[in-house]
From Swiss-Prot:
One BP annotation, GO: toxin metabolic process
Organism this protein belongs to: Actinobacillus pleuropneumoniae (Haemophilus pleuropneumoniae)
Name of the gene encoding the protein in the UniProt record: apxIC
Protein name: RTX-I toxin-activating lysine-acyltransferase ApxIC
GO MF entries: N-acyltransferase activity; protein homodimerization activity
Compartment(s): Cytoplasm
Catalysed conversion reaction: a fatty acyl-[ACP] + L-lysyl-[protein] = N(6)-(fatty acyl)-L-lysyl-[protein] + holo-[ACP] + H(+)
Pfam family, one: HlyC
Protein function: Protein-lysine acyltransferase that catalyzes fatty acylation of the protoxin, thereby converting it to the active toxin.
Active site: 24, 93
């Protein structure tokens, strides 16, 4: 018999990881709700534990192109329905405050062997963001590159029509 997942328990464990992360602890509490609750509701997260204690967490949203643009324009703009709107996977959160990022990375590559993910990576000092690409451990690298190129082409084609696109990393 499998144990039913308690969303409040997961939220508490993720909140503890946020508080333990030098980057996340500086963010407003509203971002915890925006970034974590939809992930729990849609079961689009991984929470790694060691000896019963949380050590790492990541969440992702499966966006359509419209919501991808919305997310890049304002990372705090996604609502619950956006998280399951398409097949363009974005890591929303990646938290490993105790040095377990490699374990989380391996878990994701092993458990999502044919999947593609992208993420906004922010340098905490300069606050400069960039889009990074990740793929599962079994997908052909050339195929992954081709799909990522197609994603970028579609994204850039749509952005040409956006007059007020600002690529915001935090709420103003």
């Amino acid at each position: 018999m499998s144990k039913k997942i308690n969303g409040f328990e997961v939220l508490g464990e993720v909140a503890w990881l946020w508080a333990s992360s030098p980057l996340h602890r500086k963010w407003p509490l509203s971002l915890l709700a925006i970034n974590v609750l939809p992930a729990i509701e849609s079961n689009q997260y991984v929470l790694l534990k060691r000896d019963g204690f949380p050590i790492a967490f990541c969440s992702w949203a499966n966006l359509n192109l419209e919501n991808e643009i919305k997310y890049l324009d304002d990372v705090a703009s996604l609502v619950a329905d956006d998280w399951t709107s398409g097949d363009r996977r974005w890591f929303i959160d990646w938290i490993a405050p105790f040095g377990d990022s490699a374990a989380l990375y391996k878990h994701m590559r092993d458990n999502f062997p044919n999947e593609l993910f992208r993420a906004i990576r922010v340098d905490p000092d300069s606050r400069v963001g960039k889009i990074s690409e990740f793929h599962g451990g079994k997908i052909d690298k050339k195929l992954a590159s081709k799909i990522f190129q197609q994603y970028h082409f579609e994204l850039m084609s749509e952005l040409k029509n956006k007059q007020n696109f600002k690529f915001s990393l935090v709420n103003s």
